[in-house]
Curated annotation (Swiss-Prot):
Record field: compositional bias (Polar residues): 312-325, 347-363
Record keywords: Coiled coil, mRNA processing, mRNA splicing, Nucleus, Spliceosome
GO BP of this protein: mRNA splicing, via spliceosome
Function according to Swiss-Prot or TrEMBL: Involved in pre-mRNA splicing.
Biased composition (Basic and acidic residues): 172-285, 301-311, 327-337
Membrane-spanning intervals of the chain: none
Coiled coil: 19-65, 326-389
Family per similarity comment: Belongs to the CWC25 family.
Subunit structure: Associated with the spliceosome.
Name of the protein described by the UniProt record: Pre-mRNA-splicing factor CWC25
Pfam families: Cir_N, CWC25
Subcellular location: Nucleus
Length: 428
């Protein structure tokens, strides 16, 4: 029989696993309970601090807090529908509960009717809504802000000062505005000029049609006269050509004289005189075309009409251009010149940056090559010094010989031919 500790057989022994598990569970429960108590104590402290802060706020003049749990401690006489005697009679069985319930229902009905009347009285009508909108403080503030903004827009000096304070470049903006106004004025002038030119072309077309009809009649009459009129055609043609040249010279001198006068006068009347000059040129061209068509009466009528139209169109195309188109061309040339200069500057900057990069890269490569040459020279010098001193034999000498052969210090012609035998080819 083997001996042992009989206490381990007892159910109360602390070394038993069951007892240890029981102790562990109790300790765990105690720890959880302690945590809960600590959390509850912390919540109580927070509530106490909140109440103290609310009390200080009420003492400072803030909104008073309403306690919602006072009804729990109120007496039945103050909260119930009836008096304390009625409640006691109900408890003793002397009164029925129906009367109490009916009284409460009547009170509730009266309260609901009063609420409905109040809600009907407070209904939002159109007049009430208008009054509310009119008396809205936010709307009044917005209206004042809008009025102040409009007043600021009407005051350009104040607006410019605010822009300068905000850091906005007013000069560039004013330049843009001036450029836009100039462009708008030029477009408006071009539209007016085009409209006037269209009306003038309509009048000239009507006049040319009347001239063409008259020329047709003249050509028909001259065509029907017969051979008697054809004898004088050569003289008539020479006279008409002479008149044509005289008219051209006279019109050219008149146009140059008017242009000279227009340059000396105000710019505002320049467009009117240009229009009068153009009308004069148109009239002279139409007169020249009619005289030329009369001189060429021996050709068919349809051909003369086509020549007349061609001459009138050529005279219309040879009209002088106005000053606005010249200004436009000058502005376009200036813009193109500026763009070309900017492009050239950018190209020069790119070329300089590329040259700098190339020079830095070349200097870096040169430095690396110089460093490599220096290392090779040091190694070669070390080998030469070791050989001159006679250090090492056998394997060391063999390695140094191979290194010298690698660096071409002691390689004769036979060794080089032996190495290059694979690359040599026989030439027949």
């Amino acid at each position: 029989m083997g001996g042992g500790d009989l206490n381990t057989k007892k159910s109360w022994h602390p070394l038993l696993q069951v007892n240890q598990e029981r102790v562990w569970k109790r300790e765990k429960e105690a720890l959880e309970e302690r945590k809960k108590l600590e959390e509850l104590r912390r919540e109580r402290e927070q509530e106490r601090e909140m109440q103290q802060l609310q009390r200080l706020q009420e003492e400072a003049g803030g909104k008073k807090r309403i306690d919602r749990v006072d009804w729990m401690y109120a007496t039945p006489a103050t909260t119930g529908s009836g008096s304390a005697a009625e409640m006691e009679d109900y408890l003793l069985g002397k009164k029925r509960v129906d009367k109490l319930l009916q009284g409460e229902e009547n009170k509730e009905m009266s309260k609901t009717t009063q609420k409905s009347l109040v809600s009907l009285q407070n209904a939002n009508s159109a007049r009430d809504l208008a009054a509310k909108i009119r008396e809205d403080p936010m709307l009044a503030i917005k209206q004042q802000e809008q009025a102040a903004y409009e007043a600021l827009l009407r005051d350009p000096t104040r607006l410019r000062q605010l822009k300068m304070q905000a850091g906005i470049d007013t000069d560039t903006q004013s330049k843009d505005e001036r450029r836009r106004s100039k462009e708008e004025k030029r477009r408006r002038h071009d539209r007016d000029e085009h409209r006037r030119r269209g009306s003038r072309h309509g009048e000239s077309r009507s006049e040319s049609r009347s001239h063409s009809r008259r020329d047709d009649r003249d050509r028909k009459s001259s065509w029907n006269e017969g051979s008697s009129s054809r004898r004088h055609d050569g003289d008539e043609e020479r006279r008409s050509l002479k008149r044509h040249r005289d008219d051209q010279d006279r019109d050219r001198h008149r146009y140059e004289r008017r242009l000279h006068d227009a340059d000396d006068s105000r710019p505002a009347s320049r467009s009117n005189r240009d229009r009068r000059d153009k009308d004069a040129v148109d009239e002279s061209s139409s007169r020249q075309s009619t005289s030329y068509s009369r001189s060429r009466s021996r050709s068919p009528p349809a051909r003369d009409y086509r020549n007349d139209k061609r001459l009138s169109s050529s005279s219309a195309f040879t009209r002088p251009s106005n000053g606005g188109s010249a200004r436009n061309r000058e502005e376009d040339e200036e813009r193109k010149q500026q763009a070309r200069q900017l492009k050239l500057q950018e190209m020069e900057q790119n070329a300089r940056s590329m040259e700098q990069q190339r020079s830095s890269y070349v200097s870096k490569i040169n430095a690396e090559e110089a460093e490599q040459e220096r290392r090779e020279a040091e190694l070669r010098q070390k080998l030469i010094d070791a050989r001159s001193k006679g250090h090492g034999d056998g394997k060391g000498n063999f390695i140094m010989d191979q290194q010298r052969k690698t660096f071409h210090d002691s390689v004769d012609l036979a060794e080089r031919m032996r190495r290059d035998r694979a690359r040599l080819q026989r030439v027949d």
